[in-house]
């Protein structure tokens, strides 16, 4: 999967990188966090709060955007996002 450990991580990364709102949210979370784990946690919590806890936030391909599917993205992109944030 283009260097990703599984389809879900690849799909979430694809959507974050190619959806302006998700990408900007990821940048904001990185800007306000000391490391990738904290940035990912903040990102997922914000997305969950937007759904008011009633629905799971998913990519348009139906992959859930949760911590497990997002952490690899934040670990691989943290420094890059920090530079542009």
Language-model features, listed with the residues they occupy:
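Acidic interaction surfaces
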Residues: 1-85
């Amino acid at each position: 999967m283009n260097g990703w450990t599984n389809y879900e991580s690849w799909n979430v990364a694809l959507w974050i990188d190619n959806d302006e709102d998700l990408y900007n949210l990821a940048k904001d979370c990185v800007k306000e966090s000391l490391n990738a784990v904290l940035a990912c946690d903040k990102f997922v919590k914000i997305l969950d709060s937007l759904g008011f806890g009633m629905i799971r936030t998913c990519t348009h391909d139906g992959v859930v955007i949760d911590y497990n599917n997002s952490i690899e993205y934040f670990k691989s992109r943290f420094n890059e996002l920090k530079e542009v944030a």
